[in-house]
């Protein structure tokens, strides 16, 4: 048996191991297409700001081809460094594209104010053709700008500080698009607006240079469909992270936005580790979880072997990303989602409608959190030096806090996932019973008895105070009391209806201990 277990562990480890890069064959080369990237040919701020203005106008034109749009975006993304050409050549390693750099300088003879640097050759016409979209009169909006503030006609500046603020504002809006351009483009607008408000409050961006939604949609769609552009953006992020010492302000902002980009599309894997394993609830000892725990361990080792590109595997369309989906560990994922819903309010908005979702293990996670409330881990207590008296004090305080949170209907018990609670009694999970359940059931019984007594006494008092509608009302008495006879009759009718509803609810309460809820399996199908 020991040999079998060792062989099983070795099999699982080799099964999830990434393929070895070395081999007898050579590198596979694909058919490359050429991308032209305009970069500044001198160190003048005027050249850079004019190039930025022309590229922003170029990107907003819907008639621009895909490769030309990618080249313009790469040119904007690399404008904040001192030598954009060296940066692009250093970090670009794409088997699908071949990048050609074109240096751009100022020119008074061209309509765009720019020309391509060359040795003795007049390139003004080619520059005008490139920056004017082949037809200068085709788009009035491209000439007026793509900012929400239509008073901004151009973004040409002379000082470096103003240029950095404008460039940082535009780059922030582009980088934020990468966070959900691949994983959730339909719900990206709300999160992008929250990031914009955050950086505006931090004075990292200028609110007047907010780009139009149409312009942002064009860039988001291009990021989603062009893998080469995403490869360049990820390579740029990794290059910034490797830079020692202090970084430029725009580089620090890109690293800050990276916290929303990293691990995009890996929420199931990360949340399963966070709520399913790190919480260390005793439910992990179930035999049903043994195989999936081994799978998750192999995936964690594989994640580490992938290196610095592992958090971006979904953005980079790495085929190994399918191993990390929740379908590889459905029971453990369902259990972790139940734990997460009870512990964090933000988990209530997640979509659990998957074909491999198991409601039973989801409820198992919920019950583990509820019935373990106030308990102190003996292992952590010994490591932290917590005495038994301190542990009892913590448990008592935690129990009161949990009861107060539930009584105020604020916290982990959310309405979004209320349909996932079982429509059976508390005896559905016999292994999770205890003294707390007996106290809860006893309290429910006492509450029902007191409700019946109080309801019957109130009903008798009401019947004595107000006769039923079948008895004729004394109009003279009603007139003397200052009430309208019709109002008194309507009040009596309403009181009788309330009494009838109370009787129905009382009969339902005596039949079942738990309220009737929908069947979660029917709703998830």
Swiss-Prot record:
* The keyword RNA-binding is annotated on this UniProt entry: yes
Residues annotated as region RNA packaging and organization of the helical nucleocapsid? Answer: 1-375
Q: Where in the cell is it found?
A: Virion; Host cytoplasm; Host nucleus
Q: Where is the composition biased (Basic and acidic residues)?
A: 434-452
Q: Where is this motif: Nuclear localization signal?
A: 70-77
The subunit structure is:
Homomultimer; forms the nucleocapsid. Binds to viral genomic RNA. N0 interacts (via Ncore) with the phosphoprotein (via N-terminus); this interaction allows P to chaperon N0 to avoid N polymerization and non-specific RNA binding before encapsidation. Interacts (via the Ntail) as N-RNA template with the phosphoprotein (via C-terminus XD); this interaction maintains the P/L complex anchored to the nucleocapsid template during the sequential transcription.
What does this gene product do? Answer: Forms the helical nucleocapsid (NC) in a ratio of 1 N per 6 ribonucleotides, protecting the genome from nucleases. The nucleocapsid (NC) has a helical structure with either 12.35 or 11.64 N per turn, approximately 20 nm in diameter, with a hollow central cavity approximately 5 nm in diameter. The encapsidated genomic RNA serves as template for transcription and replication; encapsidation by N is coupled to RNA synthesis. Forms the encapsidation complex with the phosphoprotein protein P. Before encapsidation, the newly synthesized free N protein, so-called N0, is chaperoned by P.
Q: What is this protein called?
A: Nucleoprotein
